[in-house]
Amino acid sequence: MEHIYQYSWMIPFIPLPVPILLGMGLLLFPTATKNLRRMWAFLSIFLLSIVMIFSIDLSIQQITGSSAYQYVWSWTINNEFSFEFGNLIDPLTSIMSILITTVGILVLIYSDSYMSHDQGYLRFFAYMSFFNTSMLGLVTSSNLIQVYIFWELVGMCSYLLIGFWFTRPIAANACQKAFVTNRVGDFGLLLGILGLYWITGSFEFQDLFEIFNNLIYNNQVHFLFVTLCAFLLFAGPVAKSAQFPLHVWLPDAMEGPTPISALIHAATMVAAGIFLVARLLPLFIGIPYIMYLISLIGIITVLLGATLALAQKDIKRGLAYSTMSQLGYMMLALGMGSYRAALFHLITHAYSKALLFLGSGSIIHSMEAVVGYSPVKSQNMVLMGGLTKHVPITKTTFLLGTLSLCGIPPLACFWSKDEILNDSWLYSPIFAVIACSTAGLTAFYMFRIYLLTFDGHLNIHFQNYSGKKSSSFYSISIWGKEEAKPINRNFCLVPLLTMNNNERATFFWKKAYQIGSNVRNRTFLSIPHFAVKTTFSYPHESDNTILFPMLILVLFTLFVGAIGIPFNQEGIDFDILSKLLTPSINLLHQNSNDFVDWYEFFKNATFSVSIAFFGIFIAFFLYKPAYSSLQNLNLLNSFAKRGPKRILWDKIINFIYDWSYNRGYIDTFYTISLTGGIRGLAELTHFFDRRVIDGITNGVGITSFFIGEGIKYVGGSRISSYLLLYLFYVLIFLFIYYFLNLLNFF
């Protein structure tokens, strides 16, 4: 067993040869490297598979009772300072390593087909391998300096992949936005690390926790300074895990390729923030104000992410806000001190969300056969619908991922989310009400995405019902460069409808132009008018290379929840996760054995599942297919004609829609206050520098010039005149000097 741990330092570096060799190959042998590009995908998958096997072996050792292992190498040693590098293998490291490698392998397999037609294929795999290396280095780090180094490398790789299609201005802007937003959190993290070193004199986690808690217990350090350092440390995870108020970069990060969206949202960048808070939880526990702040930020993010997802039309942006909300649940659990529940939800959510993102990529891939290579169209749920018969396997896998995220048993996220909801009632009833309400919103917006995508009819074809051809087509080159051509806005999504722009429809029931009395619009859905080529092609199912990782993720979604089921009946113990995390931190169940019987479990789960089903029912009520076979919608029509109450309801719904569609106006606020303020300050500084600073300098020069010119003409260009003026000024100076001395004498 000991020899296994001795080689654990190799874990982060095993995938590293791929980006190194790829870079050298493209530099020295570009043609041969490009011709053998499938080999690089195989090598990336093979090396990451080695890490996965290694990680599983280490996890088995941890479950069977092995203690944590740490090995360090001293880099610089003197009497006052010692800097060490090392690796730490404990349950948290084992969990994260398995998560990164399993999701990473499946995403790499998926990417081999998804990115096969992209000229940046090799560049993509180089970035991905370096991304996995950076994340593995982060989770195996034994000290804060090492964490910060890999933390920045993880961020760098994410920026490269978000802006992968850098010739598209919107992708370049998304990359810059992610970079600037994370700079705020990373600067706080760096200051917090330096502050902790100033207090404790150590970067190593084990020494840091022991010294820090002893100083607090003995009141040997100022509590405000300690709180400030902990707050600055927490700022890093707030930005990296897209927590309020530094969440604004996450939806725009969807401009990167879909496979990287799956990896970022499941097991790498956003998971890094949750990992760091979990790693530093023994430090945060000693500061109650910070623990409350963590839970407060978590519950705000839970609610904000869910409300912002309600009206998104882009399928990937809807899933991005879903990720933001679920990360809020994890942060809430950590703030409550429920360490096990947070990590459990991190695991279950990772596989479910990876499945959903890969499913969305398959949907986008199939839609591109109809609308072309345009994210504006291929990701727009308004133009989808009726995909069930075209992509049945993708539909089934996406449905299972949706049900899991909604918290429907026995799928993975049900077990972890239910545990967080139960713990929230013990922590704060207010937080619990918000968390449970958001569980209903989660079910609503996830089934909204599902119904808009798969139910009904393929809406893009109804735009072409008139049979007219349009030469306008919006395409993206293989590098992602946009090619915009004129757009005809005379088409309507629903066929045979005429739009009267003078009539202003309410939001909940927009003006109904019925065909056979069976057409209605759906809430949280505004319909743009795109002009596309008249074509009768249909979406098609993705190839096996894309479907295989999705089917494997279905298995994880079905069964990974079993590792944390807290049942202990007749000596049968299912709770593998608790064995792995022994001893575990849980401030809410300090005197319990973490096991419940079946009756107590069903009693606790019934409420949360009922809320989820209520959200699903509302989604079905509002978003069932517009082209329904039902001829009588008297119930819906009577609901729509209710006088003053109807107007008030419309105002409420319109407010919610505007709030969600405009991202809670938070981006607008940042644009006006921060971006606009900084630009205004820059312009003011530029004006002051040009007019005042340069004015003084130039004024002195101009004044000296005119004085010199004046003296030149007074002297008449004769040396004797210059000497006379010189003597005259000297006499005046001496006269003033002696006159002042005389005054001082008297």
Curated annotation (Swiss-Prot):
It is found in: Plastid, Chloroplast thylakoid membrane. It is a multi-pass membrane protein. Coiled coil: none annotated. The keyword Zinc does not apply. It comes from the Eukaryota. The chain crosses the membrane at residues 9-29, 40-60, 89-109, 125-145, 147-167, 185-205, 219-239, 258-278, 280-300, 327-347, 354-374, 396-416, 425-445, 546-566, 607-627, 723-743. It is an enzyme of class 7 (translocase). It catalyses: a plastoquinone + NADH + (n+1) H(+)(in) = a plastoquinol + NAD(+) + n H(+)(out); a plastoquinone + NADPH + (n+1) H(+)(in) = a plastoquinol + NADP(+) + n H(+)(out). GO terms for biological process: ATP synthesis coupled electron transport; electron transport coupled proton transport. Its EC number is 7.1.1.-. NDH is composed of at least 16 different subunits, 5 of which are encoded in the nucleus. Belongs to the complex I subunit 5 family. NDH shuttles electrons from NAD(P)H:plastoquinone, via FMN and iron-sulfur (Fe-S) centers, to quinones in the photosynthetic chain and possibly in a chloroplast respiratory chain. The immediate electron acceptor for the enzyme in this species is believed to be plastoquinone. Couples the redox reaction to proton translocation, and thus conserves the redox energy in a proton gradient. This is NAD(P)H-quinone oxidoreductase subunit 5, chloroplastic. The lineage of its organism: Eukaryota, Viridiplantae, Streptophyta, Embryophyta, Tracheophyta. The gene is ndhF.
